[in-house]
């Protein structure tokens, strides 16, 4: 047990010789400039005491002996390990320290003030350092994190203030200091910092001056400390309105403003790419063409799904009728036929459909609009593919022929229906004259599945 523990410890903390060697290598690479985060300081840093929740602190559950120890601040000079980075956000004229001083304190080897000067180090900021110095009013609290080198976290306290003295709370007269409860700035509630940021928070919260100049936390009694913590929590609860700002709402993909509008139909899209994919619906362009059968598609994804039918692989079979399909989604739609499930119901006549496409085609029969007309006989159709198949009747082009009786059909759907009704199911696969290059395999000994005739087929006598 001891040997395994010693082995684990050796893994986590390297030997002194290896640390010295690594430190020398880093110093040689970096040149004369000392490192902000030295290897020795990181490896020898002791873990922070865990925070107790603030409600237990306010209820007085901390023993008296621990209270005095918790109120004690270690006044040793420990350089801050969290960088301050300026960002132009919200101007607060109460603070006047320059960004160059903050940068110098975190990059130089001998910072002018220690972590106790900026107690709690709960200021993690975003942005890039500008060449000129920025006032501290252009800093914002982005993600409060507790990296306190004192023992205040034993009581669950997290203070958000700017302190210029060693272990003393004597800010400039122009700055108002306010304590902040750790459950608003700490990690127990992850949503609280987001709500806090949504309201344009300032680096130092405005409030009535509570700490006089030269007062140390050692001089504060437990009652005063609890009073300040309660007041800080109430102040935040009054100021913070838990609603999402435009900054956070715009970051969600589902809440993006839809600004791309189709000039033809008025449909609105949230991205220009979606509008580009929509335009072939009006132009009729089908740039993605199948190299086997020559069929065109509006989108590349539809062409990829279409190519599966040329592989003649149908691994998905129906357990009831034995019909096979290329895709599992088609099989799931097919099972609705056996179950009698018709989720798409016409609101005009009450007729149900298994598939959404058939439902849309049926709704066009109620609209009375037949915008696709034949140039030869002026016959109109609801959809363009019906007009395409109708044109075969004028040029006597019937690419699909029955191998048994030799009858030709304009559509493969009509040929398969003819074979199921009139001929044996063991018949060989039908040919494609005129060459689509596509062959449909008929499964042997299969019960004829029910078919749904469209209104156009009923009128044409198929």
From Swiss-Prot:
GO biological process assignments: cell differentiation; nervous system development
Covalent S-S links between cysteines: none
Matching SUPFAM superfamilies: beta-beta-alpha zinc fingers
SMART domains: ZnF_C2H2
Motif (Engrailed homology 1 repressor): 34-49
Composition bias, Polar residues: 448-462
InterPro entries: Zinc_finger (IPR050331), Znf_C2H2_sf (IPR036236), Znf_C2H2_type (IPR013087)
Coiled coil: none
Chief location category: nucleus
Known function: Transcription repressor. Involved in the development of the forebrain region.
Gene Ontology molecular functions: DNA binding; zinc ion binding
Family, similarity comment: Belongs to the krueppel C2H2-type zinc-finger protein family.
Localization terms from the record: Nucleus
Disordered: annotated span: 441-462
Organism: Xenopus tropicalis (Western clawed frog)
Protein name: Fez family zinc finger protein 1
Keyword terms, alphabetized: Developmental protein, Differentiation, DNA-binding, Metal-binding, Neurogenesis, Nucleus, Repeat, Repressor, Transcription, Transcription regulation, Zinc, Zinc-finger
One GO term describing the cellular component: nucleus
Zinc finger (C2H2-type): 260-282, 288-310, 316-338, 344-366, 372-394, 400-423
């Amino acid at each position: 047990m001891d040997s395994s523990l010693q082995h684990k410890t050796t893994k986590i903390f390297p030997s002194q010789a290896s640390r010295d060697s690594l430190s020398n290598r880093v110093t040689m690479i970096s040149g004369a400039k000392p490192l902000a985060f030295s290897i020795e300081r990181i490896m020898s840093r002791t873990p922070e005491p865990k925070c107790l929740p603030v409600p237990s602190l306010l209820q007085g559950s901390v023993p008296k002996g621990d209270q005095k120890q918790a109120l004690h601040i270690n006044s040793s000079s420990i350089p801050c390990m969290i960088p301050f980075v300026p960002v132009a956000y919200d101007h607060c004229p109460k603070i006047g320290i320059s960004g160059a001083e903050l940068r110098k304190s975190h990059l130089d080897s001998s910072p002018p003030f220690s972590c106790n000067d900026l107690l709690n180090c709960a200021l993690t900021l975003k942005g890039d350092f500008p060449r000129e110095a920025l006032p501290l009013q252009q800093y914002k609290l982005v993600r409060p994190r507790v990296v306190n080198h004192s023992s205040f976290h034993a009581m669950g306290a997290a203070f958000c203030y700017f302190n210029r003295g060693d272990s003393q709370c004597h800010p400039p007269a122009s700055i108002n200091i306010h304590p902040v409860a750790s459950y608003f700035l700490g990690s127990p509630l992850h949503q609280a910092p987001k709500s806090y940021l949504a309201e344009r928070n300032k680096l130092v919260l405005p409030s009535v001056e509570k700490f006089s100049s030269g007062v140390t936390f050692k001089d504060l009694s437990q009652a005063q400390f609890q009073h300040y913590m309660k007041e800080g929590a109430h102040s935040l609860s009054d100021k913070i309105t838990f609603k999402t700002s435009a900054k956070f709402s715009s970051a969600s993909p589902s809440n993006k403003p839809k600004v791309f509008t189709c000039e033809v139909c008025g449909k609105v899209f949230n991205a220009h790419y979606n509008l580009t994919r929509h335009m072939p619906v009006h132009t009729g362009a089908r740039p993605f063409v199948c190299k086997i059968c020559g069929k065109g598609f509006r989108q590349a994804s539809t062409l990829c799904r279409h190519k599966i039918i040329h592989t003649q692989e149908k691994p998905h079979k129906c357990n009831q009728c034995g019909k096979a399909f290329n895709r599992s989604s088609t099989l799931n739609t097919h099972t609705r036929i056996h179950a009698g499930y018709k989720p798409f119901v016409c609101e005009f006549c009450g007729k149900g459909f298994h598939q959404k496409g058939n439902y849309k085609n049926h709704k066009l029969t109620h609209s009375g609009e037949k915008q696709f007309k034949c140039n030869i006989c002026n016959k109109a159709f609801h959809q363009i593919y019906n007009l395409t198949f109708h044109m075969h009747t004028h040029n006597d082009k019937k690419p699909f022929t029955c191998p048994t009786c030799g009858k030709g059909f304009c559509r493969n759907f009509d040929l398969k229906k003819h074979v199921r009704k009139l001929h044996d199911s063991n018949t060989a696969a039908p040919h494609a004259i005129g060459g689509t290059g596509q062959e449909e395999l008929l499964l042997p000994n299969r019960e004829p599945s029910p078919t749904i005739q469209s209104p156009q087929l009923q009128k044409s006598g198929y």
